[in-house]
């Protein structure tokens, strides 16, 4: 079956580099492809089988080397490290429809002519940040893989074996491979060794990229959401100035209906008295409830007007189209905020369970790494390996928490922005609008890990606290 080329919009277009990389590394995302889907599916299944076979080989090595505590701890850390990759690879495959739904939420090109410049500016800021995040994470991932493979050639390639008969621990030479794993063939030298080495290099690159690309998509969603909230806060003050023209005399009120960006003085709405047939202002592009929110919203979305001819109904002599623009601006703000709330809800539903699995695995892994770090006595291969594991694991957790925390801060500050604007100069509609906004935004938007925790910097501190607690228990049990 072939997929015809389509023109993408919204988040799908913004995140297309991320989506293409995820598809390139084998993720089960087949909706945004051109050409035969069957080849894509075979490629994804082949990657899944190869990743699982290597993961089972790592687990086999863990099961077969349980005699020595240090060896058991090191193998457990390695197994937990790659558990992230396997779980996220499978998670994206199982929940691909949720990813499609979240990506498709922002495909409606809703905008408002008065705030189009602000919308475009914050969208470009979000796009730049998302691309920068993708580049930084991918460069870090590739450098980590290179460092992992490079450090393999330093130090002794041995493992500790505990002899139950003599109650002593001795070392045994093992293949010089990036990852300790059990294979049904002898990988000490020759063709089996080179095959095993290439296989593990592939596994390192693909497994780490698969996990990190899924995480980058989650963080990009949060970045986009935060910039949308910045946009809503930024247009709050001009929105109040506009609304004041409905029932309060404002000198030079016509200046409010001119394009302020790039020094332009062109009118957004032409004088309908001179040219009554002009149709320069189209409300169709501004949040139509039926089109944007589905058939369950049956309330009419038309804007209310007052006065006989739209001129004598307000003290500033606004035309009918100007009145519609003011009221549509308030509608735009409310519907855009609802849109953001809907996006945040979809993000939590899509990635919440993956966050829960990640945090559970990371807590155990970080505890064992902290225990291993106490045995570092020099800056050798062992010390660099443990430090690398520790920094990488902490960076993954911190990445989630910093963006989740920013979402909380940005959504909380919406109420402050609404209260700080000149709402007392606005119309009665605007005052009611500000009151509703303050009530609605009292509770910050959050992303939870399957309802068990909230992703924030407090979670990062809690994880560190739990690691220290478990570490002290392990030290006492030593």
Curated annotation (Swiss-Prot):
Membrane topology: Multi-pass membrane protein
Tissue expression from the record: Found specifically within most antennal and maxillary palp sensilla, as well as in a subset of proboscis sensilla.
Residue positions the entry lists as glycosylated: 167
InterPro entries: 7tm6_olfct_rcpt
GO CC annotations on file: plasma membrane
GO molecular function terms attached to this record: odorant binding; olfactory receptor activity
Subunit structure: Heterodimer with conventional odorant receptors (ORs). Complexes exist early in the endomembrane system in olfactory sensory neurons (OSNs), coupling these complexes to the conserved ciliary trafficking pathway.
Functional note: Odorant coreceptor which complexes with conventional odorant receptors (ORs) to form odorant-sensing units, providing sensitive and prolonged odorant signaling and calcium permeability. Orco is a universal and integral part of the functional odorant receptor, involved in the dendritic localization of other olfactory receptors. Plays a key role in preferred attraction of females for humans over non-human hosts for blood feeding. Human attraction plays a crucial role in the transmission of dengue and yellow fever by the mosquito.
Record's protein name: Odorant receptor coreceptor
């Amino acid at each position: 079956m072939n997929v015809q080329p389509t023109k993408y919009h919204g988040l799908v277009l913004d995140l297309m580099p991320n989506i293409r990389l995820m598809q390139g590394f084998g993720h089960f995302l087949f909706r945004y492809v051109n050409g035969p889907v069957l080849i894509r599916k075979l490629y994804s299944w082949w990657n899944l089988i190869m990743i699982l076979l290597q993961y089972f080989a790592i687990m086999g090595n863990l099961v077969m080397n349980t005699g020595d505590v240090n060896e058991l701890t090191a193998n457990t850390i390695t197994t937990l490290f790659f558990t992230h990759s396997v779980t996220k690879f499978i998670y994206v495959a199982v929940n691909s429809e949720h990813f499609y739904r979240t990506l498709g939420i922002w495909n409606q090109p809703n905008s408002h002519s008065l705030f189009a410049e602000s919308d475009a500016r914050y969208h470009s800021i979000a796009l730049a940040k998302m691309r920068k995040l993708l580049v930084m994470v991918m460069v870090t991932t590739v450098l980590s893989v290179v460092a992992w493979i490079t450090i393999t050639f330093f130090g002794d390639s041995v493992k500790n074996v505990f002899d139950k008969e003599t109650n002593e621990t001795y070392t045994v030479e093992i293949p010089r491979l990036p990852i300790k794993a059990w294979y049904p063939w002898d990988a000490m030298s020759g063709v089996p060794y080179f095959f095993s080495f290439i296989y593990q290099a592939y596994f390192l690159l693909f497994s780490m990229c698969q996990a990190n690309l899924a995480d980058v998509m989650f963080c990009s969603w949060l970045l986009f959401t935060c910039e949308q909230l910045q946009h809503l806060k930024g247009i709050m003050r001009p929105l109040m100035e506009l609304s004041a023209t409905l029932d309060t005399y404002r000198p030079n009120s016509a200046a409010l209906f001119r394009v302020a960006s790039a020094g332009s003085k062109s009118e957004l709405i032409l004088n309908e008295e001179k040219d009554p047939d002009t149709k320069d202002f189209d409300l169709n592009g501004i949040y139509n409830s039926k089109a944007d929110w589905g058939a369950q919203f049956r309330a009419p979305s038309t804007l209310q007007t007052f006065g006989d001819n739209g001129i004598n109904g307000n003290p500033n002599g606004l035309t009918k189209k100007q009145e519609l623009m003011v009221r549509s601006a308030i509608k735009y703000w409310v519907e855009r905020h609802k849109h953001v709330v809907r996006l945040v809800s979809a993000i939590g539903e899509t990635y919440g369970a993956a966050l829960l699995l990640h945090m559970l695995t990371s807590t155990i892994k970080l505890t064992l790494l902290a225990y291993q770090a106490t045995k570092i006595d020099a800056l050798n291969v062992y010390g660099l390996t443990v430090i690398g594991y520790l920094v990488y694991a902490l960076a993954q957790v911190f990445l989630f928490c910093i963006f989740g925390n920013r979402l909380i801060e940005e959504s909380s500050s919406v109420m402050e922005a609404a209260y700080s604007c000149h709402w007392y100069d606005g119309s009665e509609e605007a005052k009611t609008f500000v009151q509703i906004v303050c009530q609605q935004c009292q509770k910050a938007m959050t992303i939870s890990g399957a309802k068990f925790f909230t992703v924030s910097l407090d979670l990062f501190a809690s994880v560190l606290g739990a690691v220290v607690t478990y570490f002290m228990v392990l030290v006492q049990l030593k």
